[in-house]
Structures are given as C-alpha cells and as structure tokens.
From Swiss-Prot:
Name this protein carries in UniProt: Large ribosomal subunit protein uL3
One Pfam family per UniProt: Ribosomal_L3
Primary gene name: rplC
PTM comment text: Methylated by PrmB.
Signal peptide: none
A GO MF term: rRNA binding
Record InterPro entries: Ribosomal_uL3, Ribosomal_uL3_bac/org-type, Ribosomal_uL3_CS, Transl_B-barrel_sf
Taxonomy, superkingdom: Bacteria
Length: 246
C-alpha cells in the first residue's frame, strides 16, 4: 500500500484525447509535497507517513508546528495529512513526492469537502417532491410532511431526512481515472468533477477497489528519481576547454 498525496484543486477544464473527443477534467496541483514525519510499528503501533504541502508564513504557524517542521528540516506547510502505508513503502523524512506518483489510466480515490450551501429545505437537500400547489393546501407547499409515527414509538428515528445544513461534508469519490500528469508543473488531471471549491485541499490515494498499474512507481514518485529519469532521457553533450591554450 503506497502513500497518497495532498493536492490543491485549481478548477476544471477539458482536454482532447487521440480520438478528438473532449474530456472534462479537474486540475489538481502538487506543491512542495514532502514527508514531515513517520509512524512506525515499533514506536506508534502502525506504519504511516505524514505529508505536508504548500507554503505557510512562519508568523502564521504555531510554535508547536514550527518545532515539528524544524525537526524534519522542511519549510512550514499550509496543510498536513497522514497516510497509512505498508512497511516496504515507508518514505524518508524530507522526501518530496511529485505528480509522477500517479500514471495515466490509473484509478484513484479522491477525498474532499463539498461546497457549503447553508440551511436548505428538504426539496433542495433531499430531492423531496413537496406538497400540492393548490386544492386546499397553503403554507406547506415545500414542507417535509410527517416526521414519524404516533405515541408508539413516540420519537423521531435517527437519520430522518429533514431540512438543515447542506454541504460542507467530507466526501470520497472512488475509481476516478487519471487522464494525464505534468511533472514539471506538478499537475494531475483526473476525469470528471472533484468535491470541493477552487483552492481546496484534496487527498488523492490509489483506488482500493482497482489493482495498481504495474508501471506505477514504488515506493513513490519522488523528486530525486524523477530528476534522474530526466537526465537519463536527455542527450549528453560533452564540452572541453583547455585552460591557458594559445
């Protein structure tokens, strides 16, 4: 089990595939995503990595977090989150994960917080049909109707759909396809919509219901390995200068 990543939602756009069809995608950005702490079986009873992403001003960071980031020798982060991993996929502190962590065609599970809608009625919140528009009905056109039975059981059961706060809840969308990645700009393009507003922090993990592609990097797509791969592909040019030549 590999680590997930923390990405920032930039918005939606569309790209064209080889068949000329446009594909709606959500653009997620990885910005300085580094490991800031480890969790081991010997010390914590489980194996995990704590990731930090983004940049935060020192004056806006608490004293406790300043010491936490200083211990890891990383800059203060805007967002931190923890991901369970298997012991063989444990990453060293300070390791930076890039967009190469995911490969095109891979399925991922995306977790975000939906946009808050405020207080909403049952017709908007739960898609109720409402009451009659006329024929003796007044005031209760959009009411939810009965909330339960009679003296027995004499209560409203938990989970009864009523009016209330809509949105602003944590939602995980499973099996979203990774359309493409841009390692240089740290972008991950996933098919379709992702819960959350623009600028929201999104957690992206390998799909638990789909197999991991064979070409997915293990233990992770880290910055150093990505740099070495680029150097291997780039042509090598040799230049020599003779000092003091006349």
């Amino acid at each position: 089990m590999r680590s997930g990543v923390i990405a920032q939602k930039l918005g939606m756009t569309r790209i064209y595939n080889d068949a000329g069809e446009h594909v709606p995608v959500t653009v997620l950005r990885l910005e300085n995503c580094q490991v800031v702490a480890q969790r081991t079986v010997e010390k914590n009873g489980y194996t995990a990595v704590q990731l930090g992403v983004g940049f935060a001003k020192v004056k806006n960071t608490s004293q406790a977090l300043r010491g936490h980031f200083a211990k890891a020798s990383v800059e203060p982060k805007a967002k931190i989150a923890e991901f369970r991993v298997s012991p063989d996929n444990l990453l060293d502190i300070g390791t930076e994960i890039t967009a190469e962590h995911f490969v095109p065609g891979q399925r991922v599970d995306v977790t975000g917080t939906t946009i808050g809608k405020g207080f909403a009625g049952v017709m908007k919140r739960h898609n109720f049909g409402g009451h009659r528009a006329s024929h003796g009905n007044s005031i209760t056109h959009r009411a939810h109707g009965s909330t339960g039975q009679c003296q027995d059981p004499g209560k409203v059961f938990k989970g009864k759909k009523m009016a209330g706060h809509m949105g602003q809840v944590r939602v995980t969308t499973q099996n979203i396809e990774v359309v493409s990645t841009d390692v240089e700009r740290g972008l991950i393009l996933v098919r379709g919509a992702v819960s959350g507003s623009k600028g929201a922090w999104i957690l992206v993990r390998d799909a638990i219901k789909k197999p991991l592609p064979d070409n997915a990097p293990k233990p992770a797509g880290i910055r150093q390995l990505a740099k070495e791969k680029t150097e291997m592909v780039a042509p090598v040019t040799e230049t020599s200068e003779v000092e003091g030549a006349e």
